[in-house]
């Protein structure tokens, strides 16, 4: 791959906070991307990691994202519903309309629901109180253990464990793995209460990966891909930011004090799980920049 490095923004929807899911808790993701090199030894990615500046007023970067030099943004919606202002959403939407790539991810119930106001990709994210899934059968509690969290809360497993995912045919470029017998990636980190994503019927989007609840056996969507076109850049809607968090890659990195669920350790015992996760990250980062 030739040319300048792909400029990636890793961004949360909260201010820098020690005891929360601020950008410091995605350091392994950032370092992995920074360490990728082209065949000539040059950096493949130029990575910027940041939290939002203030709460309740437009962020100087997000509100003018379309005027930035970034090729793509990974947005971790870790807020309780107020993480993006109208000006932020407008700037992000303009960024995608001018061809920028977006990965937008959230978590259970209403965590990250400020992304509902993003043009196009916001429609892929269903929450408890906003943009509810039109399929009423999906509005049901899946994880019964953390009773303070209601639907959507798909239980793919414990933090620290991994899940086997299903690539939906045809295999999307972000899920391809030439070393896999099936040609597709198999593993991603688990989380006890993942969010709900689906493909809006009025857009060029489709579900590309699904998982299975370890509690109910229900299938749930993990990722939705929006193909680039003349009106918008490529995008991925992801069911939970925990697929990319330090804690879910390496338990030793710790988590905020409010995380109460007992973790597993399968990620540490099965190297292939992290290899697949990092391959997914690399595939997504290249696809969002249209370099896949």
Named regions from a protein language model:
Residues 16-21, 244-250:
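Short, solvent-exposed loop/turn elements at domain surfaces
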Residues 246-274:
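A solvent-exposed, charged loop/short amphipathic helix patch at secondary-structure junctions
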Residues 71-76, 103, 235-237:
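Structural motif
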Residues 61-66, 211-219, 223-229, 234, ...:
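Lipid deacylating catalytic domains
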Residues 11, 80-180:
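A glycine-rich, often tryptophan-bearing local segment used as a flexible ligand/cofactor-contacting loop or short
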Residues 15-16, 79-80, 109-111, 214, ...:
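Short, solvent-exposed loop/turn segments at secondary-structure junctions
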Residues 133-239:
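Catalytic beta-strand/loop cores that center a nucleophilic Ser/Cys/Thr
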Residues 1-72, 76, 263-269, 278, ...:
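Aromatic-Pro/Gly-enriched surface loop or interdomain linker
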